[in-house]
Amino acid sequence: MKTFFCNRTVDKGEMKRLIKWVLLNYGTEKTTRLIDKLKTMGFHYATHAGISLGIDDLSIPPIKSAFLLNAENDIYENDLRLKRGQITSVQRLEKALDIWNTTNDTLKTEVVKYFRSTDIFNPVYMMAFSGARGNISQVRQLVGMRGLMADPQGQILDFPIRRNFREGLTVTEYMISCYGARKGLVDTALRTASSGYLTRRLVDVAQSVIIQQVDCQTTQGLRIVPELEKIESQLIGRVLFEDVVDLETGRMVGYKNQDISPALALKLIKQPALTIRSPLTCRFHAVCQLCYGWNLAQQKLVQLGEAVGVLAAQSIGEPGTQLTMRTFHTGGVFAGEATEKVYSPHNGIVFYSKQARGRKIVSKYGEVAFLTFEPLKVKIKNDNTTSVLEFPSFTLLYIPPGQTVGEHQSLAELSRIENKQNFQQFEVGTENVQKEFMSNCSGQIFLPQRQNALINEDNAGTTTFNYSEMWLLAGKILDSKTLVPGDQIKNALYPIRSKINCEPSRLTTTLPLGYVFPIDSNQTSLSKLQSTDAETLKQLPLLQFSKLSADNLKFARSYALELNKTLFHCDSLSKYRFITSDLEHLPFKSKNLFFNQDTPTKKVPTFKIKFSRFGKADKFNAKEKFLLLRSVTKLVSTQTNPLKTQFANNLFVQNSINKNKKTFLEVVKPLKTFQKKTNFFPSPTHENIKSFNPSLQNGNLMSVDADYVRLNVQYGKGFSSLLNCGEVRATNCMMTEKDQIAFKSPVCDLKMKVGDYARVEDQLTTSTRIPLSGQINFITAENVLFRSVQPYLLVPGSNVVVKHGSLVQENSVLGTLMTSQSTAGDIVQGLPKVDELLEAREPQHKVLTSMHAKLSTLFSQYGKIYGLREGCELSFQKIRQFLVQEVQDVYQSQGVYIGDKHVEIIVRQMTTHVVVVDAGKTGLLPGDIVDIRRIEQLEHTGFFAGVKYRPMLLGITRAALMAESFISAASFQETKRVLSKAALEGQIDWLTGLKENVILGRLIPAGTGLY
């Protein structure tokens, strides 16, 4: 062997290349000896060097503290913009995650630089970068910062772990990192099992694919566009389908049936398109030598008898353990790589041309930035240093000219847009998501009147806004129920100007034994009610009625109730209070209590009650937003006309407002109580439900004699029974001392007047900034009195469920924000994705097109143009290429590279079956699944003439069970079914695959056994 001198660092990649080169040039024996010598030398020097980790080897780059300080400043600026109402809470969270993710990535780069510049023989550096043990991500956690963690639900927390393992974690950081650590261990265990099962299915589906002949004489090839990045998986080791001529020189570059070496591949890369041979286009039942190409391990044509199916299955299954198991849910930055940011090299003032071509845009985080349309030079100048930075086109500049920047401050973001045409499609790959936003204090809503701000208002009282804002004026919500004229008010030290807003509370009372359920529009109605036990009687607190307008109230405090009899009736309007009584009743299935004792005004909780045993529930749209489930009660009116009362609809519409403004010491008179009741079903009950009571049959008026209905009797289908609104209280909003800020300021210099709204950090005077957002309430000679205010930004498409002037408590839902998040965020990644593709499952998200639907569409198009057989073949070819590309994308995104031919062999096994539509005069039946190659063979004999079929995509499990060998299929899954079917049909197993021969103890038809 010649002596070669090679002066370079031999890491894992270099070692691979060296061994591969020796193997190809000098054969197996000499390579084995070389590897043995390398091993001995490696161990010898490892013991001399002492490559074991000590605590001193974990050196932290000094620049870390500067990076963290900058990140903290960015976070502070981000939070300030939220307080000023310039961004939404969703944008604040996404920006915070982006800041920490970018800081972490930049710090990782700095760690590598620091090691390289200070100590390249550092054990940590040598281990990680030689590929011997560990990786860059683990090094980052040892000496950089641990970074962002996920909570148990998989959501990324915006509280990062700033420390590393060298510094040690705080208790809080340790608890946060526990989620991820345990998840990682569970993931690894699950991944091993899933990967093993995937390999088993792949081997079972492809075990019969063996190289049996040299050439299949195919008339079809696979058309590809060569790409330099994919040269290894795409070209090297393939066979050319036709001669290739250089378009510029006219010289022959490659010949038909020539295998492509690495040298030839570099020449072919210049061709606009190539046609190569592929297992997808092979005419044989297995695969021929030329369609398969090289055995990639030996870099020469595959030998006859090679079990390439098993090889392909192992090549795809083995890297399965390296794939991620989790479903990413990150909303952008974590699903892909972090955007590349540019930082200021030192502090100074930024200078660049104001005439630069570009436009101002708002980034997805709500920041105003300048997008350049051409390359731009930016100067950063201070007393000592001047730096010039050159930015390419389509860079986002966050700093305007003339502004001062600090060292390591974020200046710009390099965009992935390459030209102006792509600018329009900048937001491709995002979807709109609605997220709720809450009030952070109690108070009154103020919606500024803006032209074109309001887009529409629907029946439910939901208002949709364009870009606009909303202000929440802080104040304490007081209930005026206890105030009567003459009462003294403790600590009534409130400004005279403060307004008191009154609105009817959302108190609702029900008819006797009624239960109120707040519901959303179009939610499934609770239309059926069941008594759980027809015999057992239990106790329940009942409603005590007090007289309002009638004398003849018929009500006994305590007596037993007979089944199916009226409990009581009254002919007056009533208000109620809970009492505990000895009355007995039939218990309901739901065990929930709907009201707290003696607190009838408390907001009624919403309960989910499932009556799924009783069939399909109905949808209904209730304007009143309340569904009343109640025992049927008799109401007797002495008047000749039915009970008619004026009914104020807005009392029952969710979020309804009564905008009466009164001073605080006036007592608000309670509104009258109203009652309305319709005594018929608006729609007939289901036909198949019969009642023991003839008055409850389909379409009849509702009887009021039955108190409870028996099992399987429908209680009512969307009945309109409106609520008895008892004593309605007024609610007042008043400003307390903690809701106002007073500070001294020279009034002559004021830039604002009484009633103006100001945001935090706004300029009040030339020397004073406002510490909190607020509304100017009062100005004296020395002081300015502010009312605390929280501004909210309403982005386009936001829904607001509160009205102007309405009162809200702390942590109330104000509406939903429309926000866009990356669609890559929620796509299943890694092993589950490979599994979904190879099993040809229907996608869970309806946005994604089903492969089965795609195949059907392609066949209907091609079938009309090219006929049955050609159309079937062409639609199969398209779907095969799509599947190969999708599987490869998943593996390549995780840094795993597999030869295309391995995936093609598996995909080919999935796409070789058709479903018989019209059997003609053959012995087949419509719906039979047949191998298309069998039909093609029999069509030549004329036996299969007239048969009609359509292509079918089978997942690998079904394809393995549909195998020609019933012995192979029975040993895989569903043994009884497969053997019973084979016995009934009298199938013959020709023992062509490996598995069936192994089971029977025969010589396998591979290797020398082929002959």
Curated annotation (Swiss-Prot):
Protein name (database record): DNA-directed RNA polymerase subunit beta''
Description of how the protein assembles with itself and partners: In plastids the minimal PEP RNA polymerase catalytic core is composed of four subunits: alpha, beta, beta', and beta''. When a (nuclear-encoded) sigma factor is associated with the core the holoenzyme is formed, which can initiate transcription.
Top EC class, one word: transferase
Keywords of the record: Chloroplast, DNA-directed RNA polymerase, Metal-binding, Nucleotidyltransferase, Plastid, Transcription, Transferase, Zinc
Binding positions for Zn(2+) per the UniProt entry: C216, C282, C288, C291
Function, in words: DNA-dependent RNA polymerase catalyzes the transcription of DNA into RNA using the four ribonucleoside triphosphates as substrates.
Species of origin: Ostreococcus tauri
Cofactor note: Binds 1 Zn(2+) ion per subunit.
Reaction(s) catalysed by this chain's protein: RNA(n) + a ribonucleoside 5'-triphosphate = RNA(n+1) + diphosphate
HAMAP family: RNApol_bact_RpoC2
Molecular function GO labels: DNA binding; DNA-directed RNA polymerase activity; zinc ion binding
GO terms of biological process kind: DNA-templated transcription
Swiss-Prot/TrEMBL cofactor(s): Zn(2+)
Similarity comment text for this entry: Belongs to the RNA polymerase beta' chain family. RpoC2 subfamily.
Organism lineage string: Eukaryota, Viridiplantae, Chlorophyta, Mamiellophyceae, Mamiellales
GO CC term, one of those recorded: DNA-directed RNA polymerase complex
